[in-house]
């Protein structure tokens, strides 16, 4: 589907939060990482490999990232998505929720906001569990959610683009079990925000990225 739509993706290897200190577990991780790359490397939609996410099972980040770059020099590596950055890989990768969006100390790597937002709205009758919910900021109406979302993009995300932001990944496309922070409900039946409003807001984001590319390279991006 991603190939057909012309969408690039990031592929991450699921890692247990426990057992990172055991040699056998590390060896198993490395073996499964190698198997994953071999199985998926022929898909051109994959733009980056992500060995570790939010510190889960993370170990020897630099060595793992360097191995990935040798194994597949055609793709980027996000060595530690979100937390516990060890200066490895191609991205300074951050997850930011509930506080103002900002970048860390600049270095030679690309600045990537690999998770942000998580704005949540429950639509009764369209959730996985009526009695549980998870999100980072909750709203009671679609209008309030939309207003806050557009403000987040216009006042916080877009200014970061001129500061070197290269990636912005919003949480998230759909509700996932008790997580109610999707653009769509869990059953994919309800759009929580009007598509026309989202399109207009997203076009401003795309335009800001295109302007940043033009300023840095002298060449505009495809809008």
Predicted regions and their residues:
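Substrate-binding/catalytic cleft of secreted carbohydrate-active enzymes
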Residues: 1-200, 210, 217
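Surface beta-strand/loop "capping" patches
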Residues: 204-223
